[in-house]
Design a protein with these regions (language model features):
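Flexible, solvent-exposed loop/hinge segments and secondary-structure transition points
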Residues: 14-161, 165-213
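Bacterial N-terminal signal peptides
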Residues: 1-8
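Predominantly cytoplasmic-facing regulatory/coupling regions of multi-pass membrane proteins
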Residues: 9-13
């Protein structure tokens, strides 16, 4: 697999009211993509600017306006055929952002979810394979409601809710921005400018009222 990622590192800034941080890194962007697509010939990316029209469309589907002005979607190909997509993103936990990666099929179905960086002092039980496997087979049509579509991990309710919100966003981003775009296949296999392995903390996204922090 040809994979060349130009990435930097950064330490996310904590909120003033945050609890003591216990940051543990499990994957870099490079390593998670290599594990997601071990047999792919090429892994590239495309960064999508979120203009007013796209933001409104995403907000309608998500139930909240996305916080970022652009999103990067990675794509794996072999002989020009799409093997799958990946989204590396952050979702706010109780005090700190959780960095995670979602692998999706060529049709936008969730195949795997991995925690890349966990920064909370507790709640990392969301790394348990039994919790993460609940997302397999889900698509943008699944609401991923906590304790209805996805069972929360005992003692990690907020982190469970955060991952459900983040994975659902990944399915919608891929469907709205990437599916069917042949130009993705020719994107260079290099990390987008400003992408960071440790994924600096990002502005807190508006969240659906039904999600309990």
């Amino acid at each position: 697999m040809a994979l060349v990622l130009a990435v930097g590192t950064a330490t996310p800034s904590a909120r003033a009211d945050a609890a003591p941080r216990k940051e543990t890194s499990y994957y870099s962007t490079r390593s998670v993509l290599a594990e997601f697509f071990p047999g792919s010939e090429h892994v590239g990316f495309r960064t999508f600017a979120i203009d007013q029209s796209i933001r409104a469309r995403l907000a309608q589907r998500l139930g909240y306006a996305p916080a970022r002005d652009k999103y990067t979607i990675f794509i794996a190909t072999t002989h020009g055929k799409v093997d799958g997509y990946a989204v590396v993103d952050d979702e706010q936990g109780l005090h700190q952002p959780i960095t995670f990666a979602t692998r999706l099929s060529p049709r936008g179905m969730v195949e795997r979810v991995e925690i890349m960086v966990y920064r909370e002092p507790r709640g990392d039980e969301v790394r348990d394979v039994r919790f993460r496997k609940q997302f397999q087979g889900k698509t943008s049509q699944d609401p991923l409601r906590l304790n209805r579509d996805i069972d929360a991990v005992s003692g990690a309710t907020v982190s469970s809710a955060s991952l459900a919100v983040g994975v659902r966003r990944a399915t919608i981003l891929v469907e709205e921005l990437a599916l069917g775009l042949s130009t993705l296949a020719s994107a260079p296999a290099a990390a987008p400018a400003g992408e960071r392995d440790a994924m600096a903390a990002r502005p807190r996204a508006a969240r659906p009222a039904s999600v309990n922090r």
